[in-house]
């Protein structure tokens, strides 16, 4: 139990000592820089933040790097001007900040004699400003790169539009295809006319074959008009009949499919062929009778 109490006491003393050290360091900083002011409002707090951003400093009051950093910060002086520290009897003592241009001691008030001091009077401030210019030039270069990449993207879009125009040209060449269709249709008409001519020839062959009694033509259904019995076949006069008996046991060899195709192409063939066959058969019978009478 005693050990716990002693340990707790040691921890408390250590924390208090650390806090005291931090407070002492802050107080020493204000004292070493030869100025003291109280935090009145947010503007004063922002001014202190500007001081802290300039970095840690040593006990030498004539530290030019730290002073040059404060002299180049316009926000630092603007915050001090906007602060109410002057009206609350807060004195801003400074024998170092920007005092290189105006030797003397500045006592707080509404007028300022050292705020607009040029920072170029300090060696370190000149190097700081040059670093600022370099950083601005580095920041500008990425924007140029972005702009150039944007231009490249726009050129890519124009190339894509050219590809679309070329595809449109191909479609225009495709429009010439109807002329090909016209030529093909004309060739079809010519071939159909040739079919009509060939069908006419088939009519002639049918009439000549029927006069001799041949029944092997593929376009005529039945012959047998001048068979051995001397009488017309029952199916010979009708093209759709499929053919009659020609010589006792002999039948037509043409298939029904060829007969139907002939009838579709030649609707008048069933009337022309039987008429010619009857006419020729009557002439042949008359000739035979004259020969028989002449022999008698």
UniProtKB/Swiss-Prot annotation:
Signal peptide: 1-18
Region Disordered, annotated ranges: 146-276
Ranges annotated as biased composition (Gly residues): 220-245
Entry comment on modification after translation: The GPI-anchor is attached to the protein in the endoplasmic reticulum and serves to target the protein to the cell surface. There, the glucosamine-inositol phospholipid moiety is cleaved off and the GPI-modified mannoprotein is covalently attached via its lipidless GPI glycan remnant to the 1,6-beta-glucan of the outer cell wall layer.
Record's keyword terms, sorted: Cell wall, Glycoprotein, GPI-anchor, Lipoprotein, Membrane, Secreted, Signal, Virulence
Localization in the cell: Secreted, Cell wall; Membrane
Chain intervals with Low complexity compositional bias: 146-212, 247-274
Keyword Manganese in annotation: no
Propeptide part(s) removed at maturation, as residue ranges: 276-296
Lipidation (GPI-anchor amidated glycine): 275
Residues modified by glycosylation: 229, 268
Induction (free text): Up-regulated upon milbemycin A3 oxim derivative (A3Ox) treatment.
UniProt topology in membrane: Lipid-anchor; GPI-anchor
GO CC, alphabetical: extracellular region; side of membrane
Main location: secreted
Protein family membership: Belongs to the IHD1 family.
Protein task: Probable GPI-anchored cell wall protein that may be involved in cell wall organization, hyphal growth, as well as in virulence.
Protein name, entry field: Probable cell wall protein PGA41
Gene behind this protein: PGA41
């Amino acid at each position: 139990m005693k050990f716990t109490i002693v340990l707790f006491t040691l921890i408390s003393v250590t924390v208090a000592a650390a806090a005291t050290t931090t407070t002492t360091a802050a107080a020493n900083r204000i004292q070493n820089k030869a100025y003291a002011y109280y935090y009145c409002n947010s503007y004063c707090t922002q001014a202190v933040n500007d001081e802290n951003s300039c970095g840690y400093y040593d006990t030498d009051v004539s530290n030019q790097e730290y002073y040059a950093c404060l002299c180049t910060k316009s926000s630092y002086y603007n915050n001090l001007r906007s602060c109410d520290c002057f009206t609350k009897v807060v004195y801003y003592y400074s024998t170092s900040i920007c005092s290189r241009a105006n030797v003397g001691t500045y006592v707080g008030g509404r007028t300022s004699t050292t705020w607009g001091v040029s920072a170029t009077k300090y060696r370190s401030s000149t190097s700081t400003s040059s670093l600022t210019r370099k950083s601005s030039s580095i920041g500008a270069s990425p924007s140029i790169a972005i702009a150039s990449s944007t231009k490249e993207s726009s050129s890519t879009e124009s190339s894509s539009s050219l590809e679309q125009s070329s595809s449109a040209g191909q479609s225009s060449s495709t429009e010439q295809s109807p002329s090909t269709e016209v030529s093909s249709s004309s060739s079809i008409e010519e071939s159909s006319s040739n079919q009509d001519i060939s069908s006419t020839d088939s009519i002639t062959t049918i009439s000549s074959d029927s006069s001799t009694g041949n029944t092997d033509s593929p376009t005529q259904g039945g012959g047998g008009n001048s068979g051995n019995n001397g009488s017309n076949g029952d199916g010979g006069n009708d093209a759709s009949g499929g053919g009659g008996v020609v010589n006792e046991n002999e039948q037509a060899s043409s298939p029904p499919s060829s007969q139907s195709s002939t009838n579709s192409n030649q609707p008048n063939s069933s009337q022309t062929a039987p008429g010619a066959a009857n006419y020729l058969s009557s002439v042949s019978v008359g000739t035979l009778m004259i020969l028989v009478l002449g022999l008698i």
